[in-house]
Amino acid sequence: RQRQMCIRDRPYTMYGIGEQNTPGTLQMRSMGGAGVAMRSVSTVNLLNPAAYSAAPQKTFLFNFGLEGQNYYNAQTVGGVGKRTAYNTFNFHDIAFQMPVAKRLGLGFSLTPYSSVGYRTKYYHEYDPEDPIYANVGNIQYNYQGEGDVTEVKVGLGWEPFKNFSVGIAAQYYWGDIDRTFVMTPTAITGEGTFTSTVGQDNYSISSIKGQVGVQWSPVLTQKRILTIGAAFDIGGDLNPEVTKRIYVGDIYNTTVKGDTTHLKMVLPRQFSAGIYYQTAKWAVGVDYVYQNWGDSNTATEMTGVSGSGDARTSYEVAYTNTSTFKVGVEYTPSRY
């Protein structure tokens, strides 16, 4: 299984499955992610299984993608200037497309779906009037996490009628996400002994979902192609196995709580539709994508901050339905 390099400056990946990766091959990503209606005899389409039927006879299409990113941050903290800069270089996708029979094509892809990478701190300052923390002093909470979710897709595309194709694909999601918090108290009274508390959460994901798609080309000539396409991802509960442990002191000392549960973590139902126009030199694509994150996801995240008794405080994580428009233009002066 491919493992993404951990990028530790994305605090919002503390929640759920983390940050979604932009889907598609390099060509689609350079077009703003548009490509639901893209139909080509030379490019693998990762967004719509109906495009698999475009694979020409006696031809095998293979795609391998890499992704590099540069991060730079400069800020002033307490009057002191600080800078951070680093590069990442990761595998992004492997995909192929091949004909099975006349007007029937097979497609396969292995791509990262989401990734987690963060490290942050929270300070609870000493308050002499606080009935709980008055004799403890300052407390520092450290949060960090890393992991990823990978998607494997296998599908068939069929052209039952001229210029009209349908497709179906099975999607397998798997991965591991690890989240850790450490509470470190600092005694200021010289009385009592206080030890660190370590919490570890592991999310193990393994689930199968599905996707269907259609494409229709009302204009298909030697000089130009106009295609309309749509795809629907069924989504559903990933049903991850979650192992939670809390230790006092360190991982070699007493386990306060350890259990394994199944947490509800739902991928949204996704509807996407688009239009794609191609000539020898130009390509223009427009997509609309709707995801119902808010209709099916509810989650309670634990903070690691002490509440009443042995419990940790918690808060609700809000998910919102999203609508996304993607537009891309490509110009190739001399394609052949």
What spans do the regions from the language model cover?
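N-terminal, post-signal peptide beta-strand-biased segments of exported outer-membrane/organellar beta-barrel
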Residues: 4, 8-114, 321
